[in-house]
A protein has these predicted regions:
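Generic alpha-helical secondary structure signal
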Residues: 7, 33, 130-133, 148, ...
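Metal-dependent phosphoesterase core characteristic of DEDDh/y 3'-5' exonuclease domains
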Residues: 11-116, 120-142, 154-160
Length: 177
């Protein structure tokens, strides 16, 4: 519900890595199962013309940028993992965790480890997104540096070990902040 409430309130652009292939379908099925209403998310122009050619559901629209899909030119054979792209950019990547282990961690009650994994995935995705925006010419070098600096300051202020480890590995890598 909170996910869809945020969409209703802010109309954000969603940024993901394989969001079309995993995250959003999981959210869709859970919303269906629990009867969660999300009219703006599902809007495709019937009630709001603004969404006819730019909505959250169409693969080629800009309200949801699935970076894996876009960077691969919408060709499944060209997909790369977030880990591969993050490491290529000098980012920490998965830091030893894998999505394949989430179910095991869940069964063992290691919810905080799953949360840490998801949060570092978000950080990697955000930093890949900044590189993407720079590549598209939507961020110049100064804006790119400013955004990275903001993230460094946020991570420095965080008192969670996995965020400190992410920052340390990022600053030690070739994708220096």
């Amino acid at each position: 519900e909170r996910f869809f409430d945020g969409i209703e309130k802010f109309k954000p652009v969603l940024i993901s890595w394989n969001g079309n292939g995993f995250d959003l379908p999981v959210i869709h099925y859970r919303a269906l199962r629990h009867g969660v209403a999300a009219p703006l998310y599902w809007e495709s122009g019937e009630n709001d013309r603004e969404f006819k050619f730019n909505n959250y559901l169409n693969r080629y629209h800009a309200r949801h940028l699935d970076l894996m899909d876009i960077l691969a030119g919408y060709q499944a054979r060209a997909f790369s993992s977030l880990e591969e792209v993050a490491l290529m950019l000098g980012l920490p990547g998965k830091m030893g965790m894998s999505g394949a282990r989430v179910w095991e961690y869940f069964r063992e009650g290691q919810i905080s480890d799953i949360r840490a994994y998801c949060e570092t995935d978000v950080l990697n995705t955000y930093l890949v997104y900044l590189h993407f925006e720079k590549m598209r010419g939507l961020l110049n070098e100064a804006a790119f540096s400013t955004e990275k600096h903001r993230l460094v300051e946020f991570l420095k202020a965080a008192d969670q070990g996995h965020l400190q480890e992410f920052l340390s590995q990022w600053l030690d890598g070739t994708g220096s902040a």
